Amino acid sequence: MDKLSLMHLEGLPIKGDSVFCDITMQDESLKITETSGIFKKKAKNTFSLDLNKIISMDIINEKNIQEKQKSIVGRGIAGAVLFGPAGAIVGGLSGTGKKQKIKTKNVFVISYYGKDNEVKSINFDPGLVIAFVEEFIRDYEDKCGKNQQVNEHGEIEL
């Protein structure tokens, strides 16, 4: 899977709600194109992110944030530093004290080093195509050698 079309949530200088972006993996960069139109897509703005600046790509939700907070490595990853505003989006779901069924909100997060090496994130709504997003993440990890082995203690094996 080398191309996705997802709704932008936060992280790019895009105005408006419900704006879709095409995300394309190229040889050395990730190309994100803001689009307009439904049947006849029109490119508006294009953003390029070097693959070597990407820290991680992940789908987060309330459950896997809690799992990551239990591990040594995950405490740092699950924080707002890495996930930025997406942590607040998903964290809000866990703030209810009532025992009611809550629809899980998934967020596709691309964390990367910006200018001056500050950690930033771009967040998208994977919607109903979550399986395609998972495949896109696997392809990125295979391409960039980012498959990390984590042992039973939550430590990354080097």
Please describe what each predicted stretch is.
Residues 57-158:
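Acidic, Ser/Thr- and proline-rich intrinsically disordered linker/docking segments
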Residues 1-47:
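Anionic N-terminal interaction surfaces
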Residues 40-52, 118-127:
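Short amphipathic beta-strand/extended segments with alternating polar/hydrophobic composition
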Residues 2, 17, 22, 27, ...:
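Acidic-enriched, low-complexity/disordered segments with a strong bias for Aspartate over Glutamate
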Residues 30, 46-65:
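Phosphoinositide-dependent membrane-docking surfaces
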Residues 1-7, 12, 51, 78-86, ...:
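Generic detector of solvent-exposed, compositionally biased contiguous segments
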